[in-house]
Amino acid sequence: MKIVSTKTELEAVLAPWRAADDSIAFVPTMGNLHAGHLHLVDTAKTKARRVVVSIFVNPTQFGPDEDLAAYPRTPEQDIERLRAHQADLLYLPDAADVYPDDGQPATFVEVPGLSEQLCGKFRPGHFRGVATVVCKLLNRVRPDLALFGEKDFQQLTVIRKMVRDLDMAVTIMGVPTVREPSGLAMSSRNAYLSPEQKERASLIFRTLNQAAEAVRAGERDYARIEQEASATLEAGGFSVDYVSIRRQQDLAAPSADDSALVILAAAHLGRARLIDNVLISLDTTR
């Protein structure tokens, strides 16, 4: 596996691959790699001749009171794991390489509407930072395919819309969430949880599954389902930002004839802000 840290070095490795018409899959990450990230890499290996991974803790997607300084950074461990999973190239830039203007972007990419709701309501500017850095990384790597975990479903939806609206020549692939045996979605922020909190955190997935089952069984009072799920989480010790049932395609409020739904949640447990979702496919022919 090659490791580069600058845009110039990245281009020097990618140019011969492009000249040879090698297909390229890209997995952007913020590091502290866990089994969910590595599943993205393994999936990428089945989709393309070359797999590029980036590790960059992007400062522009963190708010002023968020965990940028505390976010877990494990570069040596990450490199070992990527080698074991046979990634071809690791791009490991610093802020000055990604944002040459004093480590901050002078130009931003924003996806209005999608970016201000759900997590965007509680993390103002977050998705502007995400869209900007992902746009820059996609322009630098120019992959055929970029892979993102479905755990961050709103992020995935924002990126898909950005790529579509800007006519970017890349396919965006969502990959199902990898979970702990308890059902807890794997996340770098799980490191903030104590063993007891980690056990309790699986309540999010169980609660979302129960809500999804109610929808599949025919319940259509979505507001009541959301309220009951929120109450369950609050009773379990969480501070809930939201539980919301939306249309998968664009995260709009669902109508009666929508069959592809998603129920999303964000809640705090101790120091950790946890997000999760469950996809719902309804049989509208019945």
UniProtKB/Swiss-Prot annotation:
Pathway: Cofactor biosynthesis; (R)-pantothenate biosynthesis; (R)-pantothenate from (R)-pantoate and beta-alanine: step 1/1
Keywords recorded for this protein, A-Z: ATP-binding, Cytoplasm, Ligase, Nucleotide-binding, Pantothenate biosynthesis
Catalysis performed (reactions): (R)-pantoate + beta-alanine + ATP = (R)-pantothenate + AMP + diphosphate + H(+)
GO-annotated cellular components: cytosol
Residues noted as binding ATP in the record, renumbered to the chain: 30-37, 149-152, 178, 186-189
Binding-site list for beta-alanine: 61
Alphabetized InterPro entries for the sequence: Cyt_trans-like (IPR004821), Pantoate_ligase (IPR003721), Pantoate_ligase_C (IPR042176), Rossmann-like_a/b/a_fold (IPR014729)
Active site (UniProt): 37
Pfam families the UniProt entry points to: Pantoate_ligase
Places the protein is found: Cytoplasm
E.C. number: 6.3.2.1
Keyword hit for ATP-binding: yes
Segments traversing the membrane: none
Binding site for (R)-pantoate: 61, 155
GO molecular function: ATP binding; pantoate-beta-alanine ligase activity
GO BP of this protein: pantothenate biosynthetic process
Function: Catalyzes the condensation of pantoate with beta-alanine in an ATP-dependent reaction via a pantoyl-adenylate intermediate.
Subunit structure: Homodimer.
Annotated family: Belongs to the pantothenate synthetase family.
Additional note from the record: The reaction proceeds by a bi uni uni bi ping pong mechanism.
Name of the protein in question: Pantothenate synthetase
